[in-house]
């Protein structure tokens, strides 16, 4: 009889613990979904703000974030998949936005987006999405800190050996930062690699790339 009572107590305890575990797991899952959706919403909102700064409204009439493609090319800084977005006017592609990284920043990876006018081949804008560069030195790549990154707007790049689009220290026209050369050099080189890739893609079809919807 005593053994039966002990078994019953063990069973009840296990049942209670299992129920609490299930409820806890369910609660965590619900919080995860809510948090994930909120994060995704904030990311989309942030990208909309960025896109509005680097692609003029008169160049597109589509929802740029919905015209998303996946591209994998080492010129984008690594071997991972990157996003690119197409700006369209009356279904014609007018500009393209590339997600790219500078893997060789002073304090690690610098994540950026670069937009290019398809018609004239000029850079429309560049913005840094995230970085870990030194405050007061390398963080001048952030448009909220200085206007340095805006000086690439209107620039046209023809090759990776573009002399003018180099730091003044190396005979170019781009200002380096006082006490910080590695950061701006990493950004400049990343921009050149990305634009060269864009020009390569213009000779092919963007439709051959995978849609973000299909990828996800």
UniProtKB/Swiss-Prot annotation:
Sorted UniProt keywords: Cell inner membrane, Cell membrane, Electron transport, Flavoprotein, FMN, Membrane, Phosphoprotein, Translocase, Transmembrane, Transmembrane helix, Transport
Q: Which InterPro entries match?
A: FMN-bd, Ion_transpt_RnfG/RsxG
According to its UniProt record, this protein's enzyme class is: translocase
Q: Which residues cross the membrane?
A: 14-34
Tell me the domain of life. Bacteria
Q: Which cofactor does it need?
A: FMN
What are the recorded Gene Ontology BP terms? Answer: electron transport chain
How is this protein positioned relative to the membrane? Answer: Single-pass membrane protein
Q: GO molecular function terms here? A: electron transfer activity; FMN binding
This protein's GO cellular component annotations are: plasma membrane
Please give the Pfam families that the UniProt record associates with this protein: FMN_bind
The EC code for this enzyme is 7.-.-.-
Subcellular localization: Cell inner membrane
- Residues with the FMN phosphoryl threonine modification: 181
* Primary localization: membrane
Role according to the record: Part of a membrane-bound complex that couples electron transfer with translocation of ions across the membrane.
Query: Which family does the record assign?
Result: Belongs to the RnfG family.
Assembly mode: The complex is composed of six subunits: RnfA, RnfB, RnfC, RnfD, RnfE and RnfG.
What HAMAP family does the database record attribute to this sequence?
RsxG_RnfG
Q: What PANTHER family has UniProt attached to this entry?
A: ION-TRANSLOCATING OXIDOREDUCTASE COMPLEX SUBUNIT G
Q: What is this protein called?
A: Ion-translocating oxidoreductase complex subunit G
Q: Which organism is it from?
A: Buchnera aphidicola subsp. Baizongia pistaciae (strain Bp)
